[in-house]
């Protein structure tokens, strides 16, 4: 992978949802978190918050299932993008994504997802807790990602009752 990616540190997230607000303002001109391309999943009783956005998967299911090819990989930056002009709002990409990253914009009736705010992610810029950072893809510490994934997996087991 090349370029830059969003790195989420759930341990730093306070659940303030500032990222959702600034994303919606950047893209829509008004604060409307339901139209944000990043969502903070909250488990209030555990004090656990997880900002979720597109992972730009190596083999993105959303791209594979899109009937109009609106969902595609940008060859220059290797990001998964959605061409709003081609999107027919069928939601197959939403169903296919294991992370729930593509979202349906009920106002414009098309699927939306993180586009890194044209190279200057507003969620990163305004996250006071520094839970969301924008880093070179090659510099992601694989060991740290693995450790974080294992911690998250353990937490999910606790949340669903010890499976």
Regions found by a protein language model. Give the residues of each.
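Membrane-helix exit/interface motif
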Residues: 70-72
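N-terminal cysteine/histidine-rich coordination modules
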Residues: 1-13, 18-43
